[in-house]
Amino acid sequence: MTYWDSAAILRVYVKEPDSDVFERLLARGDGPIQVSTIAWVEILCALHRKARVGDLRPDQADSALDKYHPDSAAGRILHMGYGDDVVAEAGRIMALNFRQERSIPIRSLDLIHLATAIAGRAEALVTTDARLRRLASLARLRVLP
């Protein structure tokens, strides 16, 4: 199973220049994908931000949500909870990061995504974030695309 961060999954539901890459990746998957329950909040905020600055019309934001909900309800998207296992994994990842000669700067929510992926035993992480990609590689998690 693959874990998708919110920016990656959003590219499936909101057209971006590289959306086709993520659509193909999702289509060739072998089952449901994992996302953090926190990703839902990030998706809502991203859609609101895109609508507010004029990158999306409000009806396009609604359409993205209308597409996401059935995929989630059908079990194609598994929402992984935020619990003690994720917190412990985040601590382990940061301990590994601190031991590096040059640690990788990481935002809190990105660390939660990575820790959730590892705690959920994901085989790979789908993200576009350069720092998250580097930290996932350090934690020995395969990164896509």
Where are the predicted features?
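Internal alpha/beta domain cores that form substrate/cofactor-binding pockets in large enzymes
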Residues: 82-84, 105, 136-144
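A generic local structural motif
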Residues: 19-21, 66, 111-114
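Hydrophobic/aromatic ligand-binding patch that stacks against planar heteroaromatic rings
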Residues: 25, 116, 135
